[in-house]
Structures are given as structure tokens and as C-alpha cells.
Amino acid sequence: MSYYIAPRFLDKLAVHITKNFLNIPGVRVPLILGIHGRKGEGKTFQCELAFEKMGIEVTLISGGELESPDAGDPARLIRLRYRETAELIKVRGKMCVLMINDLDAGAGRFDEGTQYTVNTQLVNATLMNIADNPTDVQLPGSYDSNPIRRVPIIVTGNDFSTLYAPLIRDGRMEKFYWEPNRDDKVGIVGGIFAEDGLSQREIEQLVDTFPKQSIDFFSALRSRIYDIQIRDFIHKVGFERISLRVVNSLEAPPEFKKPDFSLAHLIESGNLVLGEQQRVDNSQLVDEYNRLNRGRGYQTAPPPEAPVIQPVNNSSHKQKTSNTHLSLETQEQIRQILSQGHKITFEHVDARRFRTGSWQSCGTLHIDAESDAISTLEACLVDYDGEYVRMVGIDPKGKRRVVETIIQRPNGKN
């Protein structure tokens, strides 16, 4: 099967890799090429095709390997794989690269709900150090005075803004945003269905029917066409015997005839796949289970009217109700923070964890409306009665905290 390589993707990758192996006087070449873009657009697969075309050997690291129960292991892994790749260049006498897939998933910080660990810091710092000193990469606990070969690093991800900003500066990382245009999509989808007898015009019609879908949608669509034959095969063998027939059988592997790859059938199946996508997008069940996502405007139905609470002659109830009444001073602080263009979040901690500073989010993050802030704080005071509750003002541009004010203490004072 002959797959399509987008010319501008191939050019970008080839230039970056080749430039790192050339000695150009007076030119500082970024060691890292960061390829980012929407999910499912074939960033990794296009890299694999380019490597194969150029005859380049690749050392792979997954974003999932960038975390470990032991502090320092991921940073050591990066250094070890880098040195191994440098040795490959020396021994094989050919271009080799180090590739890290989904870097943002392993070393990025998405929101306050994402844990920032020692390994996250060390991974960012290690990549920065390697980018600054690509021929002097040492393993912890040892030192080699001999310089090693320079190894280009290719990283992929969806959102590099979640990474440590100094890592992605231009001197260390060259960025390439991959968003295939219509011609690229037609070429790539044509490669996916190359053996299925679709004409160029039918490929274009298929792409134009689903213009907002990523590349992996069409790959999944081709796989789905075989579902009917596989279902019939399962029914023929029997659910009880299918495991033995497929995994542990002396019979020849099952063969399937070429299914119907007509344009009409592909569009029909594509609409079914699209329908499942929309069900996921519209369900938003995470709002019901994850406190961090509440109040972000994801509701699929209007919220119910608040019930009328009748007065109850109960001292504990009166005490809790009184705790939710915000003082004029607190309301004025909220207005001042928001008027400066900052956003607000609220955090809580019990008395035991207060000493260690282990604050946790009350729920909604980055509030920018006064009414939302007041209602969220009132709810937080009710939910965490008897704990410390504080208000945090955040500068969205600098992504830093500008105000931290304790609103409630365990003794009940606001």
C-alpha cells in the first residue's frame, strides 16, 4: 500500500534533521522540532513515512514513559536513549533521531487538576539542558569527557502551550503546526483507500462530505466496513468457540472477501461513526462526576429552578446558612479582582493539611463573572464547612497568582 506524504511535512522534517547534521558556521540550529496540531491528523504516521523515505533510524519514547514512581527515572531515560541514538549514528554511519510522542500528555500542565510532579520538572529541565548542550549529555552518577554526536529530537503533541515556556522558545525548539489542507487530505485518504478501487473524484467527494473530520476518521471508517463480515464469521463459528478458532486453532486463519467500498456505503457508514462522536460530545456526563468541570458552561439542558427553602427551627441549619452569607468586604474584593482583568478560583483545606499547604480546588476554575464567583463561593462555604477556604486571583496572561485571601477558617469566622 502506497501512502501519501504531505510535501510540506516532508520538507519541514527533512530540513530540520539535515540541518542538525550540517556544520554551518555562525548558525545556531534548534535541536528540537515540535510538531503540534489537532488530534488524529496523522502527525506520528507522517513522521514514520518520512523516516522510511529518508532511511532514518528512530529511537522512540512515549509520553507515558515520562512519569514514574521513582523521581528522576524519566529524565535518566531521555539521557540514556539520547546517548544510545548518538552511538547508533556513530556505528551505523547514517542519520538517526530521537522521537518523543505526545510530549504534552507526559510533561504538560493542563489545569489545576493536573498534578505537577518532580518528574515533570526534571523532564522539562533535561530537554532544555540537552538542547543547550547536545554533544555533552551525561548520565546521572557518571561523566564522559568525550563529546557525542548531535541527535535531532522530534516531539509531537496537541497543545505545546501546556509545556514549560522556556523549553519551547525558538532557540531550543522549532515549531511546526500540522493542519492538513484539502489537497493533503485527499492525498492521504486516497492512500488509505488505494486498494479499494475508489476513483480520485470519489475520494474528493468522501473528503468533502466529512470536511471537519480528522485523518484517523477515514482510517477508522475503512476498518468499520469489515464489521459485517466479522460479525457473520462470529455467528457462524459461535460465541462459545470464537476464542479457540481465532487464537488457538490448527485451521488456516479466516479469510474475508473484499467488502463493498462504494461511495454510498462509505458515506452511510461514515454518518454512523459521526453519530457516535456526537453522542459523546453531547452527553457531557463528566460534569456529573467531576467537580472540577462544574460551572464551565457544558450543560446540555437548562438548570432547574432553585427550590424554595422553608425556614427550619434548627440551630445547626441556621449556623450553616449564616456561613454562606458573604460580607460586603468579600464581595468588594471579588469585584476588584475581576475589574483588573484577573480570574478567580476557590480552594479549601482541612486543619491537618493546612500546615503543609495542601490546598485543593473547590470545583470551578478561572471564574470571570461576579455572580458566578459569589454563587461558587457560597456553595464552597457550605460544602466545606469547618475547613479553611481561600479566594485566589489569577492573572490569565502571566498564568500566575496575584491574590490569595482566606475567606473562612475552621473556627467559623469569615
Swiss-Prot record:
- Comp. bias (Polar residues): 311-326
Annotated residues that bind ATP are located at 37-44
Do you know which SMART domains this protein is assigned to?
Answer: RuBisCO_small
Question: Positions of the region Disordered?
Answer: 296-326
User: According to the UniProt entry, where is the signal peptide?
Assistant: none
**What InterPro entries does its record include?**
ATPase_AAA_core, P-loop_NTPase, RCA-like, RuBisCO_activase_AAA_helical, RuBisCO_ssu_dom, RuBisCO_ssu_sf
Q: Which GO terms describe its molecular function?
A: ATP binding; ATP hydrolysis activity
Database matches in PANTHER family: PTHR32429, RIBULOSE BISPHOSPHATE CARBOXYLASE_OXYGENASE ACTIVASE, CHLOROPLASTIC
Family, as annotated: Belongs to the RuBisCO activase family.
Q: What is this protein called?
A: Ribulose bisphosphate carboxylase/oxygenase activase
Q: Which organism is it from?
A: Nostoc sp. (strain PCC 7120 / SAG 25.82 / UTEX 2576)
> Source organism lineage?
Bacteria, Bacillati, Cyanobacteriota, Cyanophyceae, Nostocales
